[in-house]
């Protein structure tokens, strides 16, 4: 698991310093700098990726020959996206970038649509309250504003900023990470699908995809 986390942080562009520590909150999965990500937040990313996979390959993909490797890939990808999001929030603070009232209202609407569209089984799996979920939509929108504000030099700025940060993993909680075992998972809208309906497509995961494609060709 430690190797997997290190790889995921590297894919997010932030893998310079990985520190194992104790003293985490009950649901705190990892820390980057002075921000954190909880397990419920991480599960939103993971569930979103799982939905996409099951829509393409079917619910039983995880029991097929390459199911385990695909599972490991999306667990890693979800961690990469969550890590990248949290770093971009720190950049937003540094650059004094904030959402407008209108953008906050859009995030509130998106959260309501997403939450109401979840099945009871999905809500139980995520174990996330609506306020945290609303903030996650806000954070996603804020990260996109950071990306657009920096422009063409974003990756250089991001990589440079990452070298100043420490990364702390709640290893015992990380060991509990698992996919949702929900048969009709693909029938409900995913987080990114709802987000794009209100804010347009996000660039948050694009660098992750590029890095993964590079590795697959090496």
Describe each model-derived feature in a short phrase:
Residues 1-7:
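Sec-dependent N-terminal signal peptides
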Residues 10-13:
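C-terminal motif of bacterial Sec signal peptides marking the signal peptidase cleavage site
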Residues 15-25, 32, 121-218:
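PPIase-associated folding chaperone regions across multiple families
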Residues 20-128:
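N-terminal targeting/tethering segments
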């Amino acid at each position: 698991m430690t190797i997997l986390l290190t790889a995921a942080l590297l894919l997010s562009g932030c893998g310079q310093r990985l520190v194992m520590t104790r003293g985490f909150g009950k649901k705190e999965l990892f820390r980057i700098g002075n921000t954190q990500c909880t397990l419920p937040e991480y599960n939103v990313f993971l569930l979103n990726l799982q939905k996409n996979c099951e829509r393409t390959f079917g619910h039983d993909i995880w029991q097929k020959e390459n199911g385990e490797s695909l599972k490991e890939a999306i667990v890693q990808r979800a961690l990469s996206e969550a890590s990248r999001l949290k770093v971009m929030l720190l950049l937003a603070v540094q650059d004094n970038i904030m959402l407008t009232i209108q953008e906050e209202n859009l995030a509130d609407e998106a959260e309501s649509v997403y939450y109401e569209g979840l099945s009871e089984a999905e809500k139980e799996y995520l174990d996330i309250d609506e306020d945290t979920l609303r903030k996650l939509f806000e954070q996603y929108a804020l990260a996109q504003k950071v990306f657009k504000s920096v422009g063409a030099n974003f990756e250089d700025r991001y990589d440079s900023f990452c070298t100043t940060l420490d990364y702390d993993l709640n290893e015992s909680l990380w060991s509990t990470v698992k996919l949702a075992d929900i048969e009709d998972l693909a029938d409900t809208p995913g987080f990114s699908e709802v987000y794009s309906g209100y804010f347009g497509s996000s660039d948050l995961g694009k660098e992750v995809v590029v890095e993964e494609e590079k590795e697959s060709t090496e």
